[in-house]
Regions:
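Secreted/periplasmic proteins that engage bacterial cell-wall peptidoglycan
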Residues: 8, 12-77, 92-96
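Catalytic and binding regions of secreted/periplasmic enzymes and modules that target cell-wall glycans
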Residues: 40-41, 56-131
C-alpha cells in the first residue's frame, strides 16, 4: 500500500501502513532491525510516521519533523531528491544526515545523542520488529 500522509494526524492503521513501508525500505538497503526500530521510534514520536505532518504551532515538517522545513528542502536539493513531501524521499535523506554526507546533518555536534545507541547490542527480538 502507498504512503498515507496528512497535514494533521494519521490513524493508528495509517501509521502502521507507513511503518511497514519504513521497515521494508530500510531492510532493502541493509539496515539491521535494531537500527530500524530506533528510527521508527523517533518517527512515531515526531510525526506518528506521517510524511506530511506539519508541526502544530511551529515550522517542523515530515517524518522526523525537520525544523524549519527548509532544512529538509535544502537537503533534498543537495542530494538531488524531490519532492521533499514524499515519504520515500524522506527515507533517503535520513541516512545521509546521520552519516553527514554532503554536510547536511542537522543536530548538535555531540556524540551524546547517537553514539550510545549506534551499537547498542540489542537483538531484533529485543526490539520487537515483526513487519
Amino acid at each position: 500500500m502507498p504512503w498515507i500522509g496528512k497535514k494533521g494526524s494519521v490513524t493508528f492503521e495509517e501509521s502502521t501502513n507507513n511503518a511497514n513501508i519504513v521497515i521494508n525500505y530500510y531492510r532493502s538497503v541493509g539496515f539491521p532491525d535494531t537500527t530500524i526500530a530506533g528510527i521508527m521510534g523517533n518517527m512515531y514520536a515526531e510525526s506518528g510516521i506521517n510524511p506530511n505532518r506539519e508541526e502544530t504551532g511551529g515550522t517542523g515538517y515530515g517524518l522526523v519533523q525537520w525544523t524549519p522545513v527548509s532544512v529538509l528542502q535544502n537537503a533534498c536539493s543537495v542530494l538531488g531528491l524531490s519532492p521533499y513531501t514524499s515519504g520515500d524521499v524522506q527515507l533517503q535523506v535520513i541516512p545521509q544526515e546521520v552519516l553527514n554526507h554532503a554536510n547536511i546533518a542537522q543536530w548538535y555536534t555531540s556524540e551524546a545523542f547517537i553514539s550510545r545507541f549506534y551499537n547498542s547490542g540489542a537483538t531484533p527480538d529485543m526490539v520487537g520488529i515483526t513487519g
